[in-house]
């Protein structure tokens, strides 16, 4: 009798196509709201970390002058901390892969901020582009920039940064100058350290109905701190 009753029991009505669409829209809206909240919190944490680094630099006499060689901003990829050369104040001796004493001080200061956050990090080395060569670089600049990035990684790890957090170490030689209109400017020689976003702006840019390059995304969302 039980089986007869269950056979005769009316089936629950299936959701109409309109209801299915509404449920999908609600789920998508909820997911988008969550992504936006994660991005908002992450941006606030990055801003706090950047301010913490600036204060630390100013409070330590041996670092205060070096603060001019730090550029900190938020990009689609994350919180970017760049250690740049200045005229007469290089981070590496000529053709050397080892950061000099000045660079090591800065890297150890940066490590304290990195250790405040859980994000993975990427480290990129850059050399100067040759003047008049349309951003071409000397052949040995590729391994040189990579080796400098790796040497910087080792110093960060010796200062307490967990090796498991290092997502990428690379060298771009002079192919990505900080100042494209002045490729021989000392500041183009730099180490770029990025605390990567976990729910980032780049992923949001990729969902745009129009194709968006990383450069276009960066130009739209870059946020100097």
Question: For each of these PLM feature ranges, what is it?
Answer:
Residues 120:
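Catalytic cores of peptidoglycan-degrading enzymes
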Residues 1-79, 85-87, 202, 206-224:
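Juxtamembrane linker/hinge segments adjacent to a transmembrane helix in small membrane proteins
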Residues 113:
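Alpha-helical metal-binding/catalytic segments enriched in His/Glu/Asp
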Residues 67-69, 110, 178-182:
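Short beta-alpha junctions and helix-cap segments that line functional grooves
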Residues 40-52, 82-84, 91-104, 117, ...:
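Periplasmic OmpA-like peptidoglycan-binding domain that tethers envelope proteins to the cell wall
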């Amino acid at each position: 009798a039980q089986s007869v009753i269950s056979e005769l029991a009316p089936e629950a009505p299936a959701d109409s196509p309109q209801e299915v669409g509404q449920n999908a829209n609600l789920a998508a809206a909820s997911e988008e709201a969550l992504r936006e909240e994660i991005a908002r919190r992450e941006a606030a944490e990055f801003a706090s970390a950047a301010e913490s680094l600036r204060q630390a630099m100013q409070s330590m006499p041996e670092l205060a002058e070096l603060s001019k060689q730090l550029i900190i901003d938020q990009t689609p990829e994350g919180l970017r901390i760049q250690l740049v050369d200045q005229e007469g104040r290089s981070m590496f001796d000529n053709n050397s892969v080892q950061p000099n004493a000045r660079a090591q001080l800065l890297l150890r200061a940066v490590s304290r901020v990195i250790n405040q956050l859980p994000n993975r990090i990427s480290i990129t080395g850059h050399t100067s582009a040759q003047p008049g060569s349309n951003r071409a670089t000397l052949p040995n600049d590729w391994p040189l920039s990579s080796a400098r990035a790796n040497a910087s990684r080792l110093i960060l790890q010796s200062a307490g940064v967990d090796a498991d957090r290092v997502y990428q170490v690379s060298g771009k030689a002079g192919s990505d100058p900080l100042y494209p209109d002045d490729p021989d400017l000392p500041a183009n020689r730099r180490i770029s350290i990025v605390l990567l976003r976990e729910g980032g702006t780049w992923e949001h840019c990729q969902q745009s109905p129009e194709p968006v390059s990383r450069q276009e995304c960066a130009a739209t969302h870059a946020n100097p701190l």
